[in-house]
């Protein structure tokens, strides 16, 4: 079996095992909360307020660069990597669709990489580097 076919089958086996044997209701609720964009508003507001308070001459640049970082990460993950990798979301993959515990709608056709993860990782990296520069460490 070719490596990528083996990896695809392993991915499907792990997904099916998690969906059918390891589903936990309280964890479902926690994950739904964490994936909700409004959950993160307090963090974003805190960072913005902190920047205006501690780095006011650079605050506008910080906000503009934050928006650029978000847009870049979202574009690369959704428009470049997802079509390039072509990993179907489980709800569209006939091999595992019957195992999907549909807690939310299905979304776009492809699922890898996660745009949520790419966007948050991009923001976290930019903020870490920028804030470190602002506080001089």
Predicted regions and their residues:
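Membrane-embedded catalytic cores of phosphoryl/pyrophosphoryl-handling enzymes
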Residues: 100-137
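Hydrophobic, aromatic-rich transmembrane alpha-helices
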Residues: 43-53, 122-128
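Membrane-helix interface segments
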Residues: 26, 56-62, 132-137
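Generic beta-strand or strand-like secondary-structure segments
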Residues: 67, 71, 79-83, 122, ...
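N-terminal transmembrane-helix/juxtamembrane module of multi-pass inner/ER membrane proteins
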Residues: 1-43, 77-108
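Interfacial segments of alpha-helical transmembrane regions
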Residues: 48-77
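Short alpha-helical linear motifs
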Residues: 53-55, 72, 86-92, 119
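Hydrophobic transmembrane-helix microenvironments that flank and shape a buried ionizable site
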Residues: 33, 71-74, 113, 117
């Amino acid at each position: 079996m070719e490596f990528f076919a083996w990896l695809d089958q392993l991915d499907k086996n792990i997904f099916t095992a998690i969906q059918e044997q390891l589903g936990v209701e309280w964890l479902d609720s926690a994950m739904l909360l964490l994936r909700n964009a409004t959950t993160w508003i307090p963090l974003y507001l805190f960072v913005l307020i902190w920047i205006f308070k501690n780095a006011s001459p650079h605050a506008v640049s910080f906000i503009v660069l934050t928006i650029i970082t978000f847009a870049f990460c979202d574009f690369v993950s959704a428009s470049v990597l997802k079509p390039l990798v072509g990993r179907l979301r489980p709800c569209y993959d006939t091999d595992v669709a019957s195992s999907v515990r549909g807690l939310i709608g299905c979304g776009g056709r492809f699922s890898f990489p996660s745009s949520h993860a790419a966007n948050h990782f991009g923001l976290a990296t930019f903020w870490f580097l920028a804030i470190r520069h602002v506080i001089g460490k």
